[in-house]
């Protein structure tokens, strides 16, 4: 049994893949709780797609992919915010238009300028081809985001629940808003190499959704989201070794399965609470 567990660790590429999956899981999990609370799940989706033209342009210009992806992600967020403030359309409609437009522009650029960048690696990542340098860069981003959230999570929480009260309390709403957007963009850049554009959406939504189904206190949700993300990410890479499948989709399948379990468990728990609350008054 122990040999079955340790077999994947005999290969350096598997060790690197598990390491990068854990490193990526931490900032994604922390941010996912805020995204779910604010109703910004589609924002993570939009920014994940929007970085595509940034990656292609970065290749054309000859700059690091991370810079192009970060700028494109911020451009998507700023454009969405501007249109949201200056039009009568709902935010989800605006985000759908912006991210589909930017993703389409990325595809046009990708076809127009032949490059050595593989589309599959951009969309789905290349976790098994991760280098130690990639792990180092991703770890730096993860530490920065974890440190910011660790120091300012109460401010971000108040801004997420009640921006008006946050402003009245002396907090700078604009700084918190765009700071959160910057962290989302940075996290997407970190996930780009490992899980790709498409599958980063799951990492930015599922851990927070699962945690908020199971616990009530915010700090507990943060901790549980991180634990869930690390477990599913590392477990998905390990399981992919035996299933002979790609790690990133396997991770997403684990997240989905765990979400179903969490949903069923929370539904049963809530129904039992309702029955208990109905029995107690009658008994009194």
Residue ranges and their predicted role:
Residues 17-20, 65-73, 92-96, 139, ...:
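Loop-to-transmembrane alpha-helix initiation sites
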Residues 245-284:
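Cytosolic-side transmembrane-helix boundaries in multi-pass membrane proteins
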Residues 33-115, 211-223, 240-243, 267:
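Short loop segments and helix-boundary regions at transmembrane helix junctions
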Residues 198-249:
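Transmembrane alpha-helical segments in multi-pass inner-membrane proteins
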Residues 1-26, 273-274, 278:
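Membrane-interfacial amphipathic/re-entrant helices at transmembrane-helix boundaries
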Residues 135-207:
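Helix-loop-helix "hairpin" substructures at the membrane interface of multi-pass membrane proteins
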Residues 2-16, 87, 94-154:
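Transmembrane helix-bundle core of multi-pass membrane transporters
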Residues 50-60, 97-109, 129-130, 173-183, ...:
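Small-residue-rich segments of transmembrane alpha-helices in multi-pass membrane proteins
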């Amino acid at each position: 049994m122990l040999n079955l567990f340790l077999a994947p660790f005999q290969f350096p590429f598997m060790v690197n893949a598990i390491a990068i999956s854990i490193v990526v899981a931490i900032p994604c999990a922390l941010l996912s709780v805020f995204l779910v609370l604010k109703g910004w799940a589609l924002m993570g989706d939009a920014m994940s797609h929007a970085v595509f033209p940034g990656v292609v342009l970065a290749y054309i210009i000859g700059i690091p992919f991370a810079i192009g992806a970060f700028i494109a992600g911020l451009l998507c967020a700023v454009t969405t915010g501007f249109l949201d403030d200056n039009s009568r359309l709902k935010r989800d409609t605006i985000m759908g238009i912006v991210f589909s437009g930017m993703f389409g522009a990325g595809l046009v650029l990708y076809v127009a300028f032949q490059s050595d960048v593989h589309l599959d690696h951009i969309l789905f990542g290349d976790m098994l081809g991760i280098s130690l340098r990639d792990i180092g860069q991703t770890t730096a981003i993860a530490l920065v985001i974890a440190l910011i959230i660790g120091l300012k999570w109460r401010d971000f929480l108040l801004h997420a629940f009640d921006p008006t009260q946050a402003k009245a309390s002396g907090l700078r709403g604009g700084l918190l808003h765009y700071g959160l957007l910057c962290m989302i963009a940075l996290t997407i850049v970190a996930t780009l190499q490992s899980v790709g554009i498409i599958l980063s959406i799951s990492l930015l939504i599922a851990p927070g959704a699962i945690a908020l189904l199971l616990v009530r206190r915010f700090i507990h949700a943060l901790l549980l989201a991180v634990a869930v993300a690390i477990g599913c990410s590392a477990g998905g890479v390990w399981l992919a070794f035996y299933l002979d499948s790609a790690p990133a989709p396997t991770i997403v399948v684990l997240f989905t399965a765990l979400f179903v379990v969490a949903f069923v468990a929370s539904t049963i728990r809530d129904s039992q609470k309702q029955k208990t609350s109905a029995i107690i008054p009658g008994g009194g």
